[in-house]
Amino acid sequence: METVLPKRKSHHLQGYDYSQNGAYFITICTHQRRMLFGPNQAPVGADSISARMAARVFREIIGQYPAAQCRYFVVMPNHFHALVEIQRPRADMESAPTVISIVQAFKRYSTVEYIRLVKRGQAAPFDKHLWQRSFHDHVIRNETDYRMIAEYIQSNPRLWHKDCFYEEPSHEP
């Protein structure tokens, strides 16, 4: 008897070619939204070795692709946002990255680096997966959309206390 597994629903824009030039807003969440890149109550940007590592890895991944750039990104305690732009000349179309390949490389390399931090006792252990299986993307279609998303990314740390996953600090001794 053959078991038929349910088809996984894609979060990506149906029929859209993610290898074409454009700007993309991506969000990647930690597995089970665990707070692995900084304490929940700490101000985002506080000295977290795991958050610094994720930022470094992302810069390195983007740096490997001349056709890709990222002016705005932020590492939050349980997720990551970036506004990625892909602009390449026609002749270079085959060798340039897709948003999906950038995200895959980031997840893979950041997981390897995070495991190194765990082994050195510098980061909290995680169960099987560092990142959720997929990621959310939004194709940016105009300048207004671009500016709104850039502002959202920049203000995300300041508004962390309003996030549904934020927890008030305990004042118990």
Where do the protein language model's features map onto the residues?
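Short catalytic/metal-binding and nucleic-acid-binding patches
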Residues: M1-P173
